[in-house]
C-alpha cells in the first residue's frame, strides 16, 4: 500500500503530553494529519516537529468538525484511505499496520 494514499487523522485539543509520540508511532503507516482544534498549548508545533501535517482551527469547533477538516484535507491530498485515532494515546497504534495489511 502506497503510504501517501493513507491518511491518519488525529484530532487534538491540548495534547502536548502525548501528540509527538503518537505522530512518530504512526508516521511509517501513512500521511499523518493532526487537526489542532483550538489548542492553547504547543500541541500543533510538537505535532509538526514530529512530522505531521497540521490543520489548525483558531477556536475549538468540536470533535466532529475536527474530523471533518481532517477528511477534507486528506481528500485534497488524494488519499484513498483514512484512519482516525485520538490524540490522547488511548488507541493501540500498532493496529494500524495490521488493519492496512488486512485490506491490502
Residue ranges and their predicted role:
Residues 1-104:
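Structured catalytic core of nucleotide-sugar glycosyltransferases
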Amino acid at each position: 500500500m502506497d503510504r501517501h494514499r493513507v491518511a491518519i487523522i488525529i484530532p487534538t485539543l491540548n495534547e502536548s503530553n502525548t501528540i509527538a509520540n503518537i505522530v512518530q508511532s504512526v508516521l511509517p503507516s501513512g500521511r499523518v494529519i493532526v487537526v489542532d482544534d483550538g489548542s492553547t498549548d504547543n500541541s500543533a508545533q510538537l505535532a509538526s516537529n514530529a512530522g505531521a501535517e497540521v490543520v489548525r482551527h483558531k477556536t475549538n469547533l468540536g470533535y466532529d468538525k475536527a474530523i471533518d477538516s481532517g477528511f477534507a484535507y486528506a481528500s485534497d491530498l488524494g488519499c484513498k484511505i483514512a484512519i482516525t485515532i485520538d490524540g490522547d494515546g488511548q488507541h493501540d497504534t500498532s493496529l494500524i499496520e495490521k488493519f492496512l495489511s488486512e485490506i491490502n
